[in-house]
C-alpha cells in the first residue's frame, strides 16, 4: 500500500475535524442607528429570534442620539449603513457624494387636533399651528404646497410655531396651539390622548402627485460598499423584512419591540404598532422612485437650493436598484 493511500483516511479525518471547528464566519455589517428609532425595535427582534445568525450576518450596532449623528457616521466612514431620508441622499449626490438608499419606511405624520371643526387645510386659517421641525421640514413644505394649490398661504393666514417634536406635542396637550403637524410617533402619542388625525400627510403626498404611500426613510450606504457587499446587503434586507413581519404578526416579537418604546398605556402601544405596520414599504423600488421624483420637484420649487442643493431633479441613483429580489 502506498504512503498516499495509507494517509488518505487520516487526511480526510483531519479535514473533517478542521471544517467542523471552523464554521463559515458571519459577514460583519456596521450599523449606526438612532436609539429611539424603530430600527431599534427591529434589531431587538433580530437578536431575540436569531435572525442575524440565520442570515449569516454579524451586526455591529452603534446607537446614536439623533439622525444627524447617523449622517456624520456614514460620511466619516465609521458605519456601513444608517437610516436617513431620500431627500438628504439626493442632496448629497448632487454635491458629489455616492450614497444610495433602500426603502425602510413610508411612515409619515399628520396634523393632529382636538378641535372637531378642523378637518381640512382651509380650517387652519386664523388658527395657531405647531410645526415639528423647522421651516424646511419636508412634511411642512408639502403641506404648504398643498395649501397654496387651494389658494391658502398658511404662513400668512395662520400663526405658525416651529419647535422640536416634544415641544410641539406639549404645546398641543396644553391647548396653546389649535393643531400640530407632528412626526408619526408623536402623532401616535397624541392619538392615544384623544387627538384626531385631521390632515394625513400621506393624503397630501397623493394630492401633490404621488400614486401611493411614499417611502420617506431608507437604509443608506455607499455605492462602493454596495458593489462589494451585494449579497450581504440582500440578506440584511431579507432579515429586516422578517423582523418587520414578526413585529406585525407575533405578539412575542411585538413585546420585544415595545420594550424599546418606554412606558405607554396599552391603547397607545396598539396605535404605535398599527402605525408602524402601516409604514412598511409594499411597492417596487421603481414605483417608490417615481413618486419620490414627483415630490422632489414640489420640494425643489418651494424649498429651493437651501433645501435640495444644486440638484433640480431627483438623481436616478438615489434609490438602490440591486436588491429587488430582497423585497419583503
Regions found by a protein language model. Name each.
Residues 27-155, 159-162, 171-174, 178-184, ...:
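Short, glycine-/small- and polar/acidic-enriched structural segments
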Residues 293-328:
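Conserved C-terminal helix/tail region of periplasmic/extracytoplasmic solute-binding proteins
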Residues 86-88, 166-259:
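Pocket-lining segment of extracytoplasmic ligand-binding domains
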Residues 1-11:
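Bacterial N-terminal signal peptides that target proteins for export
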Residues 50, 54, 202-212, 278-288:
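Short, solvent-exposed loop/beta-turn-alpha elements that line the ligand-binding surface or hinge
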Residues 226-305:
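Secondary-structure end/capping motifs
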Residues 9-19:
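Bacterial N-terminal signal peptides
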Residues 20-26:
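Sec/Tat signal peptide C-region and signal peptidase I cleavage site
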Amino acid at each position: 500500500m502506498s504512503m498516499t493511500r495509507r494517509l488518505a483516511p487520516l487526511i480526510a479525518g483531519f479535514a473533517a475535524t478542521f471544517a467542523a471547528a471552523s464554521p463559515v464566519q458571519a459577514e460583519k455589517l456596521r450599523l449606526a442607528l438612532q436609539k429611539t428609532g424603530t430600527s431599534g425595535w427591529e434589531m431587538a427582534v433580530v437578536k431575540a429570534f436569531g435572525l442575524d445568525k440565520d442570515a449569516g450576518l454579524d451586526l455591529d450596532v452603534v446607537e446614536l442620539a439623533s439622525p444627524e449623528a447617523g449622517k456624520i457616521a456614514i460620511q466619516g466612514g465609521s458605519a456601513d449603513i444608517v437610516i436617513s431620508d431620500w431627500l438628504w441622499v439626493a442632496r448629497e449626490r448632487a454635491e458629489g457624494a455616492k450614497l444610495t438608499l433602500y426603502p425602510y419606511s413610508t411612515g409619515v405624520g399628520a396634523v393632529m387636533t382636538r378641535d372637531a371643526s378642523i378637518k381640512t387645510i382651509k380650517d387652519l386659517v386664523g388658527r395657531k399651528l405647531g410645526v415639528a421641525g423647522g421651516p424646511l421640514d419636508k412634511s411642512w413644505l408639502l403641506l404648504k404646497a398643498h395649501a397654496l394649490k387651494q389658494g391658502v398661504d398658511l404662513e400668512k393666514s395662520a400663526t405658525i410655531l416651529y419647535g422640536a417634536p416634544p415641544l410641539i406635542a406639549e404645546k398641543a396637550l396644553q391647548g396653546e396651539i389649535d393643531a400640530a403637524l407632528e412626526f408619526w410617533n408623536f402623532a401616535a402619542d397624541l392619538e392615544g390622548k384623544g387627538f384626531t388625525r385631521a390632515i394625513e400627510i400621506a393624503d397630501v403626498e397623493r394630492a401633490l402627485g404621488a400614486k401611493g404611500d411614499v417611502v420617506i426613510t431608507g437604509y443608506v450606504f455607499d455605492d462602493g460598499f454596495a458593489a462589494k457587499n451585494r449579497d450581504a446587503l440582500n440578506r440584511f434586507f431579507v432579515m429586516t423584512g422578517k423582523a418587520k413581519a414578526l413585529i406585525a404578526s407575533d405578539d412575542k416579537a411585538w413585546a420585544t419591540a415595545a420594550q424599546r418604546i418606554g412606558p405607554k398605556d396599552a391603547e397607545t402601544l396598539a396605535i404605535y404598532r398599527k402605525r408602524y405596520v402601516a409604514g412598511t414599504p409594499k411597492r417596487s423600488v421603481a414605483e417608490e422612485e417615481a413618486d419620490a421624483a414627483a415630490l422632489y420637484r414640489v420640494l425643489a420649487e418651494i424649498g429651493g437650493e437651501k433645501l435640495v442643493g444644486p440638484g433640480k431633479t431627483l438623481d436616478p441613483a438615489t434609490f438602490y436598484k440591486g436588491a429587488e429580489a430582497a423585497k419583503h
